[in-house]
Amino acid sequence: ISDCLVGSEMCIRDSVYGDTDKDAAFGFAYAQAEDDLKHVEMMIKMSRGELSNLNFNSKTFAAIYSLITGSGDIMENLDAIEGVELDFLFKFFNVHETVNNKISEIPEETINYIKGYADGLNYYAAKNPNLVDQSLYPATAYDLVAGMTFRMPLFYGIDHSIAELINLMDDQEEKVAMNMNAPSDNPIVASINTYFKPSGSNAFAVSKSRSQDNETMLVINSHQPLTGPVAWYEIHIKSGEGLNIMGGTFPGSPFVHVGFNENLGWGATVNQPDLSDIYELKLNPENNDQYELDGAWVNFTETDQEFKVKLFGPFSITYPIQMYHSAHGPVLKDDNKAYALRFVGMNDVNHSTAWLKMNKSKNIDEWLDALRMEQLASLNLVY
């Protein structure tokens, strides 16, 4: 039994109970912090674009200097700094601005639930000040929304498009990481596919009319690692407001992503559908801060971003970096060329509502209503 009994929340492992959904989310967060604080805090850092707040060394300095000035190989510079690859993408996707502009669209019911989860993390931190990284608290609903907004494209292989984008900037198109959607007549892909053995998550459902014991069966065989930030954390969450869900979630996520309630269940798999496009932009030869759009020269939208590098103790250095956006999406550019990336879900922030609706669904129509929000476009779902 956990000690997270506060008011109406109670944890009796592996279950969390609360009078309201928000109460249950509070207890859920507290229990998850007890069990996997390391990865919960990692998710908070990622949700703020701060994974690269690391120890300073000469290699770090050289890599960040190259990123800021645009010199050297971009991928090599990113690889030199632990966590900075994800921080770079977080800032490249301009997650903060997207969330700032759209968080008001999230229903109050969803925000209250997420706040309950954040409050649970903060309560754990208050009770265990010597165990936590106090610089991360208080965690907020904003953090959690930003984290889910950022993570969703990562599930469908947006890294392949990023690799292609970077290689185009480096004039090394054939160095692109393998993309499962690339034409099979591409000699590089054909060579790799000779050795590639298909693998991945799977799920299937069997109707009671087709089972020998007249029972409905759902098999969820998602291929996740046994440890780490995307290992499943299993939980049963029940509230007096209709939440009664059991299944798997990730550290730092307030919702069950695969599982069942008393009415229905689902599994999910992830593959690499074609959900992104790269645009080559025509630069104004007289002003490379402009690109052509509908026959006219328009300015790139510029945002000032920062990478924070830890020195020692409470001291750190902040390095500025400028990011560019076009009407098509985020841009990588130099004096001679520019490429923009557009991807599914680029401006979506309401994933939380879709997950909460699925968690509380009473029938297939309610469950499908959650999917019709089109916030989880990259997932294959088995009901």
Task: Outline where the language-model segments fall.
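Glycine- and hydrophobic-rich flexible loops that cap the catalytic core of alpha/beta enzyme folds
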Residues: 239-251, 255, 259-264, 268-383
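Amphipathic alpha-helical packing elements
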Residues: 15-16, 205-206, 214-226, 231, ...
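Glycine-rich, phosphate-binding/catalytic loops in enzymes
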Residues: 235-236
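Single conserved hydrophobic/aromatic residue that forms the stacking wall/gate
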Residues: 1-7
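A short, polar/proline- and glycine-enriched secondary-structure boundary/capping micro-motif
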Residues: 26-29, 228-231, 275-282
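Substrate-recognition/specificity elements adjacent to catalytic centers across diverse enzyme folds
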Residues: 8-9, 13-228, 240-242, 246-249, ...
